From Swiss-Prot:
Mitogen-activated protein kinase; part of the MST11-MST7-PMK1 MAP kinase (MAPK) cascade that is essential for appressorium formation, penetration and invasive growth. Central regulator of appressorium development that acts downstream of the cAMP signal. The MST11-MST7-PMK1 MAP kinase cascade transduces signals from the cell surface sensors MDB2 and SHO1 that recognize various surface signals such as surface hydrophobicity, cutin monomers, and rice leaf waxes. It comes from the Eukaryota. Coiled coil: none annotated. This is Mitogen-activated protein kinase PMK1. Gene3D superfamilies: Phosphorylase Kinase, domain 1, Transferase(Phosphotransferase) domain 1. Residues 24-312 form the Protein kinase domain. Its cofactor is Mg(2+). PANTHER family: MITOGEN-ACTIVATED PROTEIN KINASE. InterPro entries: Kinase-like_dom_sf, MAP_kinase, MAP_kinase_CS, Prot_kinase_dom, Protein_kinase_ATP_BS, Ser/Thr_kinase_AS. It catalyses: L-seryl-[protein] + ATP = O-phospho-L-seryl-[protein] + ADP + H(+); L-threonyl-[protein] + ATP = O-phospho-L-threonyl-[protein] + ADP + H(+).
Length: 356
C-alpha cells in the first residue's frame, strides 16, 4: 500500500493523499465533489489509464448510503454505456478503514463541459442521446431508476463514447416505498427533475429518467438548460411556461391537493411550440423532444419506444441494445432500513461490500 500525493488541485492550496496500491501511479486531480475527489492514474502492470475515486463518506449517513448504492450498482451492471468499476482498493483492516477507493475507467470529459465549450452537431446529439437511452434501457430492465441524470453525469471520451455515472441516488422501481420515504434525501439537480416529483403524482416511475433525458437533449440542441429554475416555484413556472397549463386529465393525475391548488392559482398559459424555441433543429429531433417532455408521466415515451424513434434510426439496433436481469428483491434492503441504521452499521455494510 503506498501513500501517494498527486499534484495539488487548481487552487494550489493543498495536497490530496491517496492510500492506494503501489500498482497505481497517481497523476492529476480531474474532479472534486461534496465527499470525494477523482484522480487520473496509470495501472503500472498493464499501462492502462484509470480514474481513482477517493470517497470519504463516513461523516454523514447520506454519503454512506450513496456510496453503498454506487458500489453495488456499478458492480451489478456490465454495459458499454455505464461506467464500470475495475477494482476497489481493499482496506488493510476495518479499524483503519476510513476511505473508499473505486478504480474506474478514465473518461476525458463530461457532457456539461462539452455543452459549455462547443456547439453540438445534430449527429452528435443523436449519438449521445442514443447511448444515454441504451444505458437507460439496461437500468430500467433491471428495475433501477437512476434519478439523477444530468449532463455532468454523462462521461465522454474523444471518440464520443458515452457512459452514465453516479448511481448514488438510484432506487428500485419495483418496490414503491411510500413516496415521502422515496423523496427524503432527494437532492437531484432541480433543472432535470420531472414535474411529478415536485407535484407528488400517484407514484414515481421510470418516466422520471425519461424526462431528464428530454432536458439533456434540449440542452444539447440549444447550448443552455431548458428549465434553469432558481427554486421549486420558479422551476414549475418555467416548465408550465413552455408546456402550457396541464389538461384536466393531467391535472387530476396530480395526487397532492396543495399542488393542484397551486397550479390552479397560476394564470392560464398556452403551450409554446418547440419549433419557436429551437428554430434550427430538425423536425425529428423536436418530435422526440415533445415525447420525452410530456407533462404527464403516463403519456411520456418509454426508453424502448424512444430507441425506436426515427430520430435515432441511424444508430438503433434492436440486436445490440442489451437488457439486464432484474435486481434481486433484497438488493436495496439497506435502503428500507436506512432511517434506523447508524453510521457504524453503514460502514460495516460498505466494508463487507468491498471485501466480498
Amino acid at each position: 500500500m503506498s501513500r501517494a500525493n498527486p499534484p495539488s488541485n487548481s487552487s494550489g492550496s493543498r495536497k490530496i493523499s491517496f492510500n492506494v496500491s503501489e500498482q497505481y501511479d497517481i497523476q492529476d486531480v480531474v474532479g472534486e465533489g461534496a465527499y470525494g475527489v477523482v484522480c487520473s492514474a496509470i495501472h503500472k502492470p498493464s499501462g492502462q489509464k484509470v480514474a481513482i475515486k477517493k470517497i470519504t463518506p463516513f461523516d454523514h449517513s447520506m454519503f454512506c448510503l450513496r456510496t453503498l448504492r454506487e458500489m453495488k450498482l456499478l458492480r451489478y451492471f456490465n454495459h458499454e454505456n455505464i461506467i464500470s468499476i475495475l477494482d476497489i482498493q481493499k482496506p488493510r483492516s476495518y479499524e483503519t478503514f476510513n476511505e473508499v477507493y473505486l478504480i474506474q475507467e478514465l473518461m476525458e470529459t463530461d457532457m456539461h463541459r462539452v455543452i459549455r465549450t462547443q456547439d453540438l452537431s445534430d449527429d452528435h446529439c443523436q449519438y449521445f442521446i442514443y447511448q444515454t437511452l441504451r444505458a437507460l434501457k439496461a437500468m430500467h430492465s433491471a428495475n433501477v431508476l437512476h434519478r439523477d441524470l444530468k449532463p455532468s453525469n454523462l462521461l465522454l471520451n474523444a471518440n464520443c463514447d458515452l457512459k452514465v455515472c453516479d448511481f448514488g441516488l438510484a432506487r428500485s422501481a419495483a418496490s414503491q416505498e411510500n413516496n415521502s420515504g422515496f423523496m427524503t434525501e432527494y437532492v437531484a439537480t432541480r433543472w432535470y427533475r420531472a414535474p411529478e416529483i415536485m407535484l407528488t403524482f400517484k407514484e414515481y416511475t421510470k418516466a422520471i429518467d425519461v424526462w431528464s433525458v428530454g432536458c439533456i437533449l434540449a440542452e444539447m440542441l440549444s447550448g443552455k438548460p431548458l428549465f434553469p429554475g432558481k427554486d421549486y416555484h420558479h422551476q414549475l413556472t418555467l416548465i408550465l411556461d413552455v408546456l402550457g397549463t396541464p389538461t384536466m386529465e393531467d391535472y387530476y393525475g396530480i395526487k397532492s391537493r396543495r399542488a393542484r391548488e397551486y397550479i390552479r392559482s397560476l394564470p392560464f398559459k398556452k403551450k409554446v411550440p418547440f419549433r419557436t424555441l429551437f428554430p434550427k433543429t430538425s423536425d425529428l429531433a423536436l418530435d422526440l423532444l415533445e415525447k420525452l417532455l410530456a407533462f404527464n408521466p403516463v403519456k411520456r415515451i418509454t426508453v424502448e419506444e424512444a430507441l425506436k424513434h426515427p430520430y435515432l434510426e441511424p444508430y438503433h439496433d434492436p440486436d445490440d441494445e442489451p437488457t439486464a436481469p432484474p435486481i434481486p428483491e433484497e438488493f436495496f434492503d439497506f435502503d428500507k432500513h436506512k432511517d434506523n441504521l447508524s453510521k457504524e452499521q453503514l460502514k460495516q455494510f460498505i466494508y463487507q461490500e468491498i471485501m466480498r
